[in-house]
Amino acid sequence: APKGPSLFEVQDMIENSSKPIISAIHGTALGGGLEVALTCHYRIAVPSARCGLPEVKLGLLPGAGGTQRLPRIVGAQKALQMVTSGEHIPAKECLEIGLIDEIASEDSLLEDAIKFASVIVKENKPLVKVKENEENIKEDKGNHALFTAFRKSIARRTRGFLAPEYNIQCIEAAVNKPFEEGIKVERDLFTKLVTGSQSA
């Protein structure tokens, strides 16, 4: 039987689409759901929506580009907090940190997303490829002190667990390496966690 495309192939198709792709989020966009949303050109969510990368709670890290795209949107510091805590962020905060671009009405998400898309087309707005966005990470390139301080701040809570440290190493790679190299770091460390003894 023919095999469907892999998640990574789907993400590439979304990111490289010549038509605007908007992720319309309701409920929760967690883990892989958020990782797919991060490949879309824009994100819109209802007020009750929540987003997060909770893999660390299972002894894992986001394995579909989440650690590489997230800091390119929200910056290294917020990305570090999100991947090491696994917290679910409410829509209002997602908007404040730039994770989503607009809040829709609770009962008209589809209509609002279509309206949002038509404005993008009408105003000829760029189709944002998150993986190419260096703007939010450039000031942290080579800033080892940021990562050292962050490691210290969570040391007591995470002692003995590999996943928080590997998540930090992935964000560090996102900040300091080209996207494709960072993805390789993420996949290697993800594999180590999946095959190790600490993952659920």
Range-by-range predicted roles:
Residues 4, 8, 31, 88:
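Glycine-rich phosphate-binding loop at the start of an alpha helix
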Residues 191-200:
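Long amphipathic alpha-helix in the N-terminal Rossmann-like dinucleotide-binding domain
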Residues 35-39, 83-189:
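Amphipathic alpha-helical segments at domain termini/boundaries
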Residues 70, 78-87:
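Short helix- or helix-capping micro-motifs
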Residues 1-26, 66-68, 73, 199-200:
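An acidic, glycine-rich surface segment that forms the CoA-thioester-binding/catalytic face
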Residues 14-58, 62:
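Glycine-rich beta-to-alpha active-site loop
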